[in-house]
Amino acid sequence: MSIPAMPFITGPVAEPQEQLRLSPPRGRLSAIIPLSKVQEVLWVDYLRQPWATHYNLTLKVDLTGSNLSLESIMNNIHKLGSRHDMLRTTFHIDSSAQHTSQSYMAVHDAASSFQNIAIVSDDARLQQALRRGLDLSTEFPVQWIVHQAYSVVDGRLVAAHTVYAMGHHIAVDGTSMSHLSRELVQLIQDGDTTTPPPPPPPSYGEFVQRQAAYLRSPEAQDAEAFWLAQIAHTTPHRWTHAAPLPASAPGHDYRKMDTWAFFPSDELAAWSQLYRTSWFRVAVSVIGLVTAGHARPAPHHDSTLQVAFGARAPSFAGCVSHMANTMPIRQPVSSLLRRSGSATFAELVQLVGKNISQAKKNEMYPFLSLVEAAARDGEDTAAASRVAVTLSPRLADDRCTLYPVNGVWDLFFCFLEHADGGVALGVISDPAVFGPAALAALRADVLRTVALSQQTPDFPLTSALSCLADRQVATLAGGPDVEDVDAVIAARVVSDWIRSRAATQPDEIALSNGEDGTSLTYGALDASSDRKAVHLQRLGAGRNDVVVLQLGAVFDMVAWILAVHKAGACFVVLDRQLPLARKQAILRVADAKLFVSDAFDDAYFADCATPPTTVSVWADTAVPADAHLAPVSGAAPTDLAYLVFTSGSTGLPKAIEVEHQNLSSYVSATRAVVPVGRGSRVLQFAPFAFDASVLEWAVTLSYGGTLCFVQHPALLVGDYLADMVDLNQINFFHTTPSVLATIPDGRRLPSLRALSVGGEASSAGLLDKWSRRLHLIHAYGPTETTVICATEHILPASDTLPSPSNIGRANPHVALLICPEDAETVLGPGVTGEICIAGPQVTRGYRGQPALTAAQFRTMEHNGRVTRMYRSGDRGFIGDDGKLHILGRMNNREIKLRGFRMDLAAIEKSILDNCPEVMTASVQVVDDKLVAFACPATLQGDAIRQRIALDLPSYSVPADITAVDSLPLNTNGKVDHKEVLQQFGASTGPAAAIKPVIVTKTAPKKKELQTSDSNLVDRLEASITTLWQKVLGCRDAPGPDVTFYNAGGHSILLSALHKELVTLYPAAKISLLDVFYNPTIRRQAQRLSELVGDDGFIPSSSVSDVSAQDVATPGNSTTATSVAADAPLFAIVGMAGRFPGADSVEAMWELLMAQRDGITTSDGAGAESADLAEGEVFVPRYGSINGLEDFRASDWNMSDEDAQVLDPQKRMFLMIAEEALQDASIPVRTVSGSNIGTFVGIAPNTYLSSALPSSVSSSAFERRYKAVLDPTASTLTAYKLNLLGPSMDVSAACASSLVAVHQALRALRAGDCAAALVGGVSLAYPQLGGYATSDGKIFSARGQCRPLDAAADGSVPADGVAAVVLKPLVAAQTDGDRVYAVIQGHAIGTDGAVDKIGFTVPSSSGQAKVISAAMADARLARHQGVRYVEMHGSGTSIGDALEYKGIERAVAAYEATGGESRCSSGAISPTGTEQQPSDTKQTPRTLFVGSNKGNFGNAEAASGLFSLIKASLAVSRGVVPPLRQLGDCNELMGVAEGSTVQPLRKQLRLEKGDRVGVTALGYGGVNAHCILASLEAVEERE
């Protein structure tokens, strides 16, 4: 049969200019009922968008042919209104209410209430009536429209009527509309008969009471647990297609319903029978599968669909009301794909059906209660579903049609039952999310999957959609079968698998850094590594040649690693933090051919027999574009892939040689071990010099995931580690037990679904805690066996927790053997011996150390092939279940501590070699730290530590060196290390209690202050020294200039030190980065004194009780504050203005989007009054505004004379200020006044001297001193509107209004006012309709303002007035304000005389300084968070070029320093990290620039606010309007095709997290800059 048409006729509408003010109920009332929980969520939406219609649903009843009169139809409607309370209800909230839960419904008396019925006769009025919003406080929630159509039949005029019931979802649901359809049809059929009415339905108030009782019952608690489980570890759909550009035509936001299919009743019955469940559950499974396929891969998280449940007890069947409950149902597509690549659709239906069955039992639990419960648990996905599904009940007959609500979802699948039992599938999509092509692809996949599901239930999920084919976790693109060991070994180069990934998913992100917003795609990474590989080959790199890499830029490091492999060579990473002696030793052993670095020192190669050729990281730019990568001739699986260096007992570092077959075997084996695939986000935790990094980069990129980096990898412990997991949405990472134990228990880490832990012994408690939260992998593997060779998987559902000694089973093709010491005999289960590992992961041995290789490595036969075996030196046994248990080390003294492998004998040798005064030494592990015991007792521990720190890695330097008289010896006369540990290894016990330095808030005199400051630093040094001793566990106090790491510290202890400092000095808010970047006691004391502030000093008799006084904090904080301190954010909550060509903010936006010109062309009559000089011309073009005559004196309690004297700038601003405050929902002219500051950037008053009639004032005194008596705009506005906060007029030329914003924000930050009204106004008199100019002047002789254009010849003057209302963001959110944008950073400054050839010429360096300061204030680690800058851009060639260069300089300078600012004392206040050169700097994300002066001209003092309002609307609406017109770029700007900064020629779609900058420049050198973000962006950051 043909598919019935299903048009859709409702949609959102633009808000009217006036704001909705809810009214109290009027008239006779029969009941007051509180809102139910299911209504509350819709009420909150309504209060935010009262005029939107996305929650209107409409019932259509076609009465054509019924011969009913209009009067009869209206009477039947009124009968329904009398019968059902909800049809006579209005909705309200008391003005004193503190929460929306205090809202209520007012049921109006039936006898005096009449339904609102509109009678329309044309389609246009019908559409208008159906597309309007409702004032629910004055209108009943269901509006009736009767459409009359007339036709001539047999010479008679016949009327046909169609009835529409348009109801807000807060009052009616689909069941209610179905019931109304039946009652209305029944009334029509009954006609005038006196059929007794049915019994009255139960009251909705009874439902509200029952719901309240239910929510306090044990059943509700069980339901809450079920629903929380449905949303646990889920993620919203993030669609793979690009969002369509916004349409410019009006009405583009109207959604429509497309009918995709019609299913006859017999087809539905067969569908149900095939799966032995309801067809609806099968259909929901189809939708869940297809939408998952069209969303970006999320292998560790399922998604949910919002499914509508009736939630209506049988007794309430006839109650017209809203009871429907739309709840999230988990779609376990990712879970099934993660478990098995052969998962079937039938399995999906079974799981979805089970979820829906349980949901039906718990459908009474309201969605809002779930959101509240989830918020208590820190879960934010409850309301994140982007797809909804509903089944609308059958209507009375085929004359009735139901049009569902739009909702707020990206996709809404509506199954509508027809009278014949068939069901139509209609789909409503958000046109801003799904364009026609994306929707057509989705439709095709839905219908294809439906057809497939009707043929067979057991089809594999991956065969339904091509986009799901590679969604299984851990699949190699074109890789070998993991079971085919020969194919795995022959694969040779892992970089080939990564290249295959680049071919299949070139545009997906390979590398990412959430802190600075940078990323690199697979395609870009592949191309970059190709260029580098070509260069390496041209320099002679080939098979088994060693290439040393020492780089700071992590993206570059990955690219160079791949490049080395593509060139056929072997890489070794040199840690730049190593001491020089260690680097020299490594380079001597490596015998490298090439040394790739971003910094060189000839001293590195002092011990090299043949120094390597040095290669700059920028050298690959010289590679010709047509150069091609040559295949590696004779490549073999046994070629070297990389070297890893570990400590050696002889003092010479051991270089472990890893072959390509070892690497490919390990990466292939991880398919069965590590849950990583497309869409996985993996943290690069380990430094590249350590083999654990191979688990991260090689595995992640081979399997198509995203490798995520951080700015401060050395600080990846505790809260910073948790912050980075959240910021980067990490799904998996590998770490050590010591680091894992530092993550606070309260951190939820919702994105983290799997964790690998290893490198040292774990505790049972740690494994137990984390295995309850996620998939925990207990890993084991010496470096000699390629990263990890055995794992134990502990799932959250595990009944028992394995012993910490249990590290599970071997990787595929790896054999775990237990042998006696120094023998190859294989011991049986349960027998303890040395753990030996055999198989293709066992490496070649130690470079240049054949004797050691022969001692540790053997050759044996395993699985019918000859393979290597490695003797690990670890002691353990294999249990009866085949799992390996590790019990510690054999008799050697090689250990692992905090994941670092070290040889205690090597550390002792370094002490003896570098410190001739030491006779004997023994290094031990005491309380999880290295301690050296040395004799004689006269030794100086600090001196020994300083010397060996030049030879050993920092992690191998003992935290404490204890001098003793002698060390115990064994019978052979050697140091008895076991006896040393027994005699001297007892814990030194806890440090003595640390007393804080108390800082008072008493302000001393200047002389006293200077003395006290010095005393403060000294006393803080003493306090911090004691803290160091406590944290480091050392007896001797470290020197004030010894770094924390050289004193024996490491990242875990640094985190502990930071916690101690925060506990001791909470008001200072010292951050972890503060501690890290100030690594000595002296620097930390200086930094802490700065954070305490200049007004604090230490009294001579310090109090020891920390609770007695608080640490002082300065009231005038400077830019040298800690970035970790909570920087306040500010919201723009109100806006208004008059602009050239636009009388409102909305009209301004429309003009900008349409790229129209708001500048007016006059008749030129003003030339007569222009007083033109020789060479001048009058240009009849001006940016004029409307409304200058709208000011009415009586509205402002002024006489006509007072108004006529008053500067029109101030008249206009009074009106606009009031509009802005009203837009912000702030009451104006209140009796008690409002704590609002007023800050106005205003142009000079030209009205006084040029247009004010002299006869206006009768007072000679006032005429004589009119300039003195002229009121300031800010104070006058504060007086007229009764605003009590600070007031200020700002005169900074074209920067005035943006400088006023800066001053307002400072007042808000200081607490001087609760909100701020900021204005900008410029009106020039006399009003001539044009201006005088001449060639070479700043005003255009052609009357065209063309910013950034080669044809620009100047600006066009304009008038304008604008105002914004600012609040602290926290206050705005608390008050429920609409937030247009958030001001995240701001700064002002002046050029001075820097780089200026004259007063009027701008300075690029001055502008760059202010832009960088604003970025720092916004805490942007790099510029790339800013996507667009709204320039001052006045259309003067030199001015535009200098401003453009200033932006370029700001970007370059900020990138070079990472935003770091240095305090006067030398302590560092970090705002980022120093960035090393990287590929991303060669092709960074483009920063676009533009200017609105091409649309409006230069409104001078108001122009800054023009730009701020434009930018606010851009971040709010997600799109930036382009320049009005742009031909060739201004040549002075030097814009090239690859320039980082580019003019905006077309609309720019902003992504979540993009920031927008705003610049204003004032005559003579005043610079102001703000950085704006959307509310969603800052909420995500928080």
Swiss-Prot record:
CDD domains: PKS (cd00833). Residues 33-387 are annotated as: Condensation (C) domain. It is an enzyme of class 6 (ligase). Gene3D superfamilies: 3.30.300.30, 3.40.47.10, ACP-like (1.10.1200.10), Chloramphenicol acetyltransferase-like domain (3.30.559.10), N-terminal domain of ligase-like (3.40.50.12780), Nonribosomal peptide synthetase, condensation domain (3.30.559.30). One of its GO terms (molecular function) is 3-oxoacyl-[acyl-carrier-protein] synthase activity. GO terms for biological process: amino acid activation for nonribosomal peptide biosynthetic process; fatty acid biosynthetic process; secondary metabolite biosynthetic process. The active site is at residues 1294, 1432, 1498. GO terms for cellular component: cytoplasm. Residues 1015-1092 form the Carrier domain. Residues 1460-1485 are annotated as: Disordered. Residues 1462-1485 have a biased composition (Polar residues). Keywords: Ligase, Multifunctional enzyme, Phosphopantetheine, Phosphoprotein, Transferase, Virulence. Its EC number is 6.3.2.50. Residues 1127-1574 form the Ketosynthase family 3 (KS3) domain. It catalyses: acetoacetyl-CoA + L-isoleucine + ATP = tenuazonic acid + AMP + diphosphate + CoA + 2 H(+). Its cofactor is pantetheine 4'-phosphate. PROSITE patterns: AMP_BINDING (PS00455), KS3_1 (PS00606), KS3_2 (PS52004), THIOLASE_1 (PS00098). Residues 499-892 are annotated as: Adenylation (A) domain. NCBIfam families: AA-adenyl-dom. Hybrid PKS-NRPS synthetase that mediates the biosynthesis of the toxin tenuazonic acid (TeA), an inhibitor of protein biosynthesis on ribosomes by suppressing the release of new protein. TAS1 alone is sufficient for TeA synthesis via the condensation of isoleucine (Ile) with acetoacetyl-CoA by the N-terminal NRPS module and subsequent cyclization conducted by the C-terminal KS domain. TAS1 has the following domain architecture: C-A-T-KS. The N-terminal NRPS module contains the condensation (C), adenylation (A), and thiolation (T) domains and catalyzes the formation of the amide linkage between the isoleucine (Ile) with acetoacetyl-CoA. The PKS portion of TAS1 has only a ketosynthase (KS) domain and this domain is indispensable for TAS1 activity by conducting the final cyclization step for tenuazonic acid release. In the N-terminal section; belongs to the NRP synthetase family. PANTHER family: FATTY ACID SYNTHASE, NONRIBOSOMAL PEPTIDE SYNTHETASE. This is Hybrid PKS-NRPS synthetase TAS1.
